[in-house]
């Protein structure tokens, strides 16, 4: 099985891009190795890795930047690029660097476990004789919404929202779809659209110009994976009532009255009774971090 990596990243003198690949076997054991990529223009970095271990069942990877041999920058990596293994396929990855997204707060446990619990089960995607896979993140989707694909040819609805090709959720806020490349005409122009998860009814187009597939074709026994920039739709801003309080101001009959952490439980109960949903605490510092006069000014 061959893995071909390709990513756009403009480097400076002394910098290079490397990919860290983690292989997972049937027993869940992992092995990680980092491979240097090559470039001709300091902009497009490419590399190839050959996997010969037949026990491997899946793999994931991320990119890092090295400067004079030392790693100094790594991708955000909160959502790993994870794929199941098909030893009959050659994988071609066309990636974009993953910076911390503007909507990174939607990936925190406050949202994924409390405000908007994420309970959707991820689904596996089918492979074809020649496979085109498109992936995009869409954390701004509302409950009851899903993502679909529309394009400039019959296989993708010819821009008719009534024939949008529905995508599957394959990770946290990550939506993917696989197409048989034999049914796709290149060049391919497309957009992602929001649909109703139950009825499939059209909801909204993403903004901006049409996306254009950065490849000219897919050969037999190849899986071309296109990891697109995030969905271009402005989501509704989540709002809630809350209270701000420093821990040292908390007082209760069951504590010493000097801001015990145990008083936070009572504070949470009071917040719930008042109908509020958020508690913001002022920073709590270890006041012995510097061991000098600065420790008396934690802010």
Kindly label every feature range from the protein language model.
Residues 202, 207-236, 262-266, 278, ...:
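Extended acidic/polar, glycine-enriched regions
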Residues 2-13, 20-22, 134-137, 243-252:
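Short, Lys/Arg-rich amphipathic segments at extreme N-termini
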Residues 10-56, 66-86, 140-186, 195-218, ...:
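Aromatic-rich carbohydrate-binding modules that target alpha-glucans
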Residues 89:
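Catalytic "initiation/cleavage/transfer" segments centered on a nucleophilic residue
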Residues 1-11, 94-145, 222-236:
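Basic K/R-rich, polyanion-interacting modules in nucleoproteins and related proteins
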Residues 126-127, 192, 270:
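Non-catalytic accessory regions flanking glycosidase/transglycosidase catalytic cores in CAZymes
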Residues 232-299:
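Acidic/aromatic-lined carbohydrate-recognition and catalytic surfaces
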């Amino acid at each position: 099985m061959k893995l071909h990596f390709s990513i756009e990243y403009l480097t400076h003198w002394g910098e290079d891009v490397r990919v860290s690949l983690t292989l997972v076997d049937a027993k869940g054991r992992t092995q990680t190795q980092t491979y240097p990529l090559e470039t001709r223009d300091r902009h497009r970095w490419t590399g190839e890795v050959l996997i010969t271990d037949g026990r491997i069942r899946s793999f994931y990877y991320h990119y890092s930047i090295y400067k004079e041999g030392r790693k100094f920058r790594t991708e955000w990596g909160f959502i790993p690029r994870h794929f199941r293994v098909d030893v009959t396929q050659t994988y071609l990855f066309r990636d974009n660097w993953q910076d911390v997204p503007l909507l990174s707060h939607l990936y925190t446990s406050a949202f994924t476990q409390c405000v908007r619990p994420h309970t959707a089960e991820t689904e596996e995607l089918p492979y074809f004789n020649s496979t085109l896979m498109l992936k995009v993140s869409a954390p701004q989707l509302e409950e009851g919404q899903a993502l679909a694909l529309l394009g400039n040819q019959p296989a993708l609805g010819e821009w008719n929202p009534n024939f949008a090709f529905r995508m599957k959720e394959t990770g946290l806020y990550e939506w993917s779809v696989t197409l048989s490349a034999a049914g796709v005409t290149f060049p391919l122009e497309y957009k992602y659209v929001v649909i109703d998860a139950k009825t499939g009814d059209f909801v909204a187009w993403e903004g901006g110009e049409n996306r254009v597939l950065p490849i000219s074709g897919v050969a037999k026994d190849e899986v071309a994976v296109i990891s697109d920039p995030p969905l271009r739709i402005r989501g509704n801003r989540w709002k809630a009532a809350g209270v701000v309080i420093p821990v040292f101001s908390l007082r209760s009959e069951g504590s010493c009255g000097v801001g015990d952490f145990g008083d936070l439980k009572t504070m949470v109960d009071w917040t719930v009774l008042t109908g509020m949903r958020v508690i913001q605490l002022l920073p709590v510092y270890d006041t012995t971090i510097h061991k000098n006069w600065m420790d008396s000014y934690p802010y």
